[in-house]
Amino acid sequence: MYQVSPQLSPRQALPTMYDLPSEEIGDPGLPDEFHLLQPELLRDTFRPPSYPEDEVFTASDLNLYYDLRQSQWYKRPDWFAVLGPLRRYDQQNLRLSYVVWQEGVNPFIAIELLSPGTEKEDLGQTLREINQPPNKWTVYEQILRIPYYFVFDRYTDTFHAFGLTMNRYQPLTLEGQGIWIEEIQLGLGLWQGSFQNRERLWLRWYDRDGNWLLTPAESEKQRADLEKQRADQVLLALSQEQQRTEEAEAEVARLKPLLQQSGINLD
């Protein structure tokens, strides 16, 4: 008598992030320091007000597996964001990759930072060879159908924005600071400033009032500055009160002899 193994559901039988490689030997690393810092600034300022923290996931340079029919194919966006009810992992179980059929939610935004070696791939200008993966543009537009796709060239400070309309990316017109995304109540624009002691033009998120969203470090500095300002105001008030007291005591000391001459004893 033999025991029959229970049948797995189709979803249980699919490869997960534990079955798929999270890195590939021979893959090039980050092309420059900008590709490290810019995603960090995007992550630190991406706070959609209508989504709780546990429904927001962002990543950079993480394998994004997108096609179950070709389960080994992946793209590695410079930065992407996922919104909605996300798969739960315990605190010690970090994502190795983002596998769309395992997660159940596709990215909402993808951002690519152009470099000479990836520009044609990112802009959909490469031809697909037989039995080879499609380029990023095709994956984002036609397979994952990511609603918003942004491309930034740090060499020319050129910023391109695309929105998905009728299953095709259409250019979006930059207005004011950048592009306003009503669904998440955030805008993405170009900010001139210093981040990690690097002064240049950066991509950064802003709120409905046009205020650039602060990074945690900036928020902490702002809090510390306000605390110092309040402390300085208290010290100034105490100093002024002490000065008034000293002036009053000096005036009493000046008037005391005159009053005594008039027969008035203050003691």
Language model region names:
Residues D32-S60, D67-F80:
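Acidic-basic catalytic patches of nuclease active cores, encompassing PD-(D/E)XK
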